């Protein structure tokens, strides 16, 4: 390859990176409530698809609640629910309240299993925090994750 071709290739790569950077920086800012609603919908869809990892994507490593002291224990429960076959998950439109780097979402969750057996039917309140994350896997950004939840009585299920 000629030296002039190498220079042109490098210039083209640099210009391409600049254009990509400008496009990423100019991406519209999504409101906090919409980010949380999108994550809740993605988790609901993941639940119906038996994708425990997809559900746990919204959960912080610092997660704990009245029943579980870590996301690992939560994963065990979700795996057990998923083993019982297909589930149908309906969720009321969540009410999201954001205060700085914390937020609360409240909605009603109804889960049915085989033969329309009710697996879960309660209101769920989730506590969210804004944590460090990455967009496109490399660009540092803040993401909303669940750190705690109140979801009624699990002992009946």
Indicate residue ranges for each PLM-predicted region.
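Short beta-strand edge/turn micro-motifs at domain boundaries
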Residues: 2-8, 118-157
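Short, low-complexity N-terminal intrinsically disordered segments enriched in polar/charged residues
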Residues: 2-57
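Non-catalytic, surface-exposed connector residues within folded enzymatic/regulatory domains
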Residues: 30, 67-68, 118
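Short beta-strand segments enriched in hydrophobic/aromatic residues
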Residues: 47, 59, 109-111
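Short, solvent-exposed secondary-structure junction/capping segments
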Residues: 56-72
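Solvent-exposed loop/turn segments at secondary-structure junctions
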Residues: 63, 111-112, 153-156
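Surface-exposed, charged secondary-structure patches
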Residues: 76-123, 127
């Amino acid at each position: 390859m000629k030296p002039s071709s190498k220079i042109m290739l490098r210039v083209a790569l640099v210009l391409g990176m600049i254009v990509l950077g400008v496009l990423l920086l100019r991406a519209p800012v999504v409101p906090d409530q919409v980010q949380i609603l999108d994550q809740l919908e993605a988790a609901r869809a993941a639940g119906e698809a038996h994708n425990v990892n997809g559900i746990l994507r919204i959960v912080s490593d610092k997660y704990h609640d009245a029943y579980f002291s870590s996301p690992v224990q939560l994963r065990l429960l979700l795996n057990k629910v998923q083993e019982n076959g297909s589930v149908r998950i309906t969720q009321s439109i969540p009410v999201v309240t954001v205060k700085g780097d914390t937020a609360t979402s409240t909605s009603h969750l109804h889960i049915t299993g085989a033969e329309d057996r009710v697996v879960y039917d309660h209101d769920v309140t989730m506590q969210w925090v804004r944590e460090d994350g990455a967009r496109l896997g490399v660009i540092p950004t803040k993401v909303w994750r669940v750190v705690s939840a109140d979801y009624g009585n699990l002992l009946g299920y």
